[in-house]
Amino acid sequence: MEAVVTSSQTVRAEVAELLGIEESALDPDADLIASGLDSIRMMSLSGRWRKQGIDVRFAAMAANPTVAAWTRLVGERTAESPGAATQSGDTAASAGDPDAPFPLAPIQHALWVGRNELTELGGVAAHLYVEFDGAGVDPERLRTAAAALAARHPMLRVDILGDGMQRISDRDLPVKVTDLRHLDVADAEQQLEVIRHAKSHQLLEGEVLELALTLLPDGRTRLHVDLDMQAADAVSYRNFMADLAALYRGAQLPELQYTYRQYRSAFTATPAPTVDEDRRWWTERIPDLPEPPALPLVPRAEQRDPRRGTRRWHFLDTDIRDRLFAAARARGITPAMAFAASYAGTLARWSTSRHFLLNLPMFGREPFHPDVDKLVGDFTSSLMLDVDFTEAHTPAQRARVMQEALHTSAEHATYSGLSVLRDLSRHHGSPSLAPFVFTSALGLGDLFAGDVTDQFGTPVWHISQGPQVLLDAQVTPFDGGLLVNWDVREDAFRPGVIDAMFAYQLAELERLAADDAAWDAADPPAVPPAQRAVRDAVNDTGARRSDDALHDGFFRTAAHTPDATAVIGSTGTLTYAELRERVLAVTGALQVAGIKPGDTVAVMGPKCADQVTALLAIHAAGAVYVPIGADQPADRADSILQTAGVRMALACGDEPPTFLPALTIAEAVRVGSRVHGVTPATVEPDRVAYVLFTSGSTGAPKGVEVTHAAAMNTLEFINDHFGIGPSDRSLALSTLEGDLSVLDVFGMLRAGGSLVVVDEAQRRDPDSWARLIAEHSVTVLHWMPGWLEMLLEVGGALPSVRVVPTGGDWVRTEMVRELRRAAPGVRFAGLGGATETAIHNTICEPGELPREWSAVPFGRPLPNNACRVVAADGADCPDWVPGELWVGGRGIARGYRGRPDLTAERFVVHDGRTWYRTGDLVRYLPDGQIDFVGRADHRVKISGYRIELGEVEAALRRIAGVEAAVAAVLTAPGDGRGEQLAAIVRASSPAVTVDELTRRMAELVPPHMVPSHIALVEAVPFTVGGKIDRRAVTAELTRSMAERANAQAPTYRVPSTALERALADIVSTVLDRDSVGADDDFFELGGDSVLATQAVARIREWLDSPGVMVTDIFAARRVGALARRLVDHESGSDRLEGVAELYLEVADMNSADVASALHSTSAQASR
């Protein structure tokens, strides 16, 4: 046993060694962070002491980073654990037969499993590929050096076996030579590019290191080094490349007296004393750990090449490095954490959440033997960091948050990050990954030593990639400065995202190096200049503005074309002159009743053509209208009347309400016809035109005050854009409570066209709509998407319809295609908007519908409007990043009547402008269009993951045969799993099945976004207002889930064959369960890659099935399917069944039976 040393001199010596300085130069009271000691080396030292049984915690070291303080800590902890000692290299030297297989290290195992296509983000080898551009490298000398290198480092000859073990082989390390000296320079470069592309993405099979040399014109050479990082980590790469260079120049290297195999044996034999405590600490935090950063990703099934890796890199020179390091250390921040914070801050800016999980690889070697630092192998571990930048708004604040997160996690680092991820997977019931990685090689020395570049040339191309990683950001010393690399799964990200992110981080690093004040300054905009230019162009607030009030256009038309048809209703037709006469009569009646400009008048009762007269008359009196439909509950109607401050009411029908001053519209016409000299009032455009009451999130009505100017901005654009004129007729389907009625009434009558009014008896009947369209040759349908869906389901041609602007809900692309078939030549547009944005605020008029669209985007802002996509901290989101839609400009409402608190909350001032916060989650596309993602109040959390229901719906709609989909969250009856994700789907064909939908969703979205229940329906329910009826959807799903629960009581298929029974016994043992059915899912029962490896090892040994692989368990998942795969491997079941019966016979024995059988066998053998 090696005594633990606690003297000041020893602590000082260890720290001096880590800093690379003489012990005498180290002041015991100096701040070690300011002296250059980084977090990674501090963690290594803490881990070394804890391995020795001295419980010195990393956080305690970081709190007071001096040699003197650490000496006291070591002394105190040693006194508490007087028996502290560590196993020496000698006692650990025996590691069994050196030719026998030995277990993979945890990171090795994860990389091995990740090569499997069936794992999420898998099918990729962890490899590092580098090209050295040099001159005069001799192929034979290189071959000789390579052979010596392979002999020196056994791990460069390792075989990774199918059961999760590894074994050292006796193969050599060949060098492939390609001679391109006969080509000209251009052709040689082209061939180099071909070689590079092949090697950058290859899966090495049967070898872990490939050396190749290309001979180029003019004596140049290119050395290609491709390493499978299952065999060696980055520090090991540096080691063997330095050895290769030394061997190439003829140096004699002393033989290593220790092996990686021995190291792993010693490591396993000396677990950290705090591992159980650390496991408990992490277990308590599992439910609260965040998900990875939610960046703009492309569904895997839509990626061109899911495995393609690319690299972005940038070199920071010595001056920038030194200034960054000095500024960080002056703030008590290690340089590694400064770089980590810059990377994480960039992720936060492109993520929908500023609270996420980050993966940090850690490099550390226990000093079991003097040769440990010279070995080649995998010595890495991982650390999960809970990063929360919610309240961190400057680079310095983020760096402190990162450093504190590191200190917290490092305190409990003996329980590995991989173990944490496995625990998370079990907690969530689906695979949990941490695919965003930050790798710091600061303090580890140059990856490419000077001797390496002297012998082989300058590294001109390098890339690394790994399974289950989307983005690995690295910072490493290089050529006197720092190399900042991003290795990216390129096609996983939306176009332009990675380039914008990388540029943003580099700009921050250079800003922090140049200006010390930048560390404490707010962040600059993340929207790149090119994206800003596109947004400036589409957010045009300088278009022509009308000073008209809403009713002015009607009166001009009535003066110019009095005999034209204005209104067509179920009771008759009115010309413009007739309508004007009725309007002025009702205006007179209002004046007689004491209504003054600015007063509020309700329009009540069932939908009817007379309501057109009422609206125009109220405005002609200078008043404000408030519609209240016939189907409003009495309490709600009373609340609206009180909040709006209604002075009187005009009502459709024969009987006016009795609870306030009121007239029927017909009575108002009679009363007003006796009033002479009535003229329409002149109303300033900034006066309120109407108050529409909508339901808030609490269900309480809120009255939106919309001015004439705001509504006119939308109305004029629609009329001008679509050329709506005297020959047009629109079918007015919307009730007055829906703001589409504003365009129906005031827009059409301003244009001189005719309004065909659907009455109360017809407004729920699509057959009546189709008849009215045909009968009156309707040309314009300004409708909700749900109404169009209902109309198209009725069927039939719509030859007269030429313009269909629709908005207010999702617009299916397939519905647009159906509409174009029914109405050839129709001009269709999808519009985004809300009552608070004066009906519409964006427009998308698509030509050919792109295949990848599942719904029509909101589009671009209307003239005189502007749109922002805003993150939770108020900053503008870059392209593709979802945020809340804010709308500003002429077309927004004044606020909420009688609710100054709500007005202040939803109508906010930013940069001197008022913006309406819509609550819609949207994203800017690169062409300036705004794409609807979902509602903020439809953002839910399932199994610890935040989910946008709109994203789930969009993914479902991308599946062939799906016409419509609506997602919801609800609790299954009698189910103990809590809230679940569910969806209804309307399909175009009976061939679309729930199983097929589930399978395709698994290809498009992460597991937590795949609905656990899907119900196929004949129709999606809509409200009377034409929007998806989500309450009805929830009711339908609740009913469907209850039916399924009743029909599918938990089933358990007993394993039927001997092989199934044997496999079930092995699997149940590995999973620590009483029993496993033939159709039970291994992973749903709590299995993971480590347990799968254990199961494979036992199946190989106990069932004599050496061909079984971990991939078989990933593919089969169930005992029954696994049995079939094993039989297929052997082209028959007889032998396996016999072995399984023997296994079961032994498994059923008790210990006494086994001892007796062994004794009997021994006795027979002796005879």
UniProtKB/Swiss-Prot annotation:
Entry superkingdom: Bacteria
Biological processes per GO annotation: amino acid activation for nonribosomal peptide biosynthetic process; lipid biosynthetic process; secondary metabolite biosynthetic process
Enzyme class: ligase
Cofactor binding annotation: Binds 2 phosphopantetheines covalently.
Region of interest (Adenylation), residue spans: 575-967
Post-translational modification as stated in the protein's UniProt record: 4'-phosphopantetheine is transferred from CoA to a specific serine in each of the two carrier protein domains, leading to their activation from apo to holo forms.
Cofactor(s) demanded: pantetheine 4'-phosphate
Annotated EC: 6.3.2.-
Alphabetical keyword list: Ligase, Multifunctional enzyme, Phosphopantetheine, Phosphoprotein, Repeat
GO molecular function: ligase activity; phosphopantetheine binding
UniProt note: domains: Modular protein that contains an aryl carrier protein (ArCP) domain which bears a phosphopantetheinyl arm to attach the activated salicylic acid, a condensation/cyclization domain involved in the formation of the oxazoline ring, an adenylation domain which activates the serine or threonine residue into an aminoacyl-AMP ester, and a peptidyl carrier protein (PCP) domain which bears a phosphopantetheinyl arm to attach the activated serine or threonine.
Function: Involved in the initial steps of the mycobactin biosynthetic pathway. Putatively couples activated salicylic acid with serine or threonine and cyclizes this precursor to the hydroxyphenyloxazoline ring system present in this class of siderophores.
Family that this chain belongs to: Belongs to the ATP-dependent AMP-binding enzyme family. MbtB subfamily.
Protein name: Phenyloxazoline synthase MbtB
Organism: Mycobacterium sp. (strain MCS)
Name of the encoding gene: mbtB
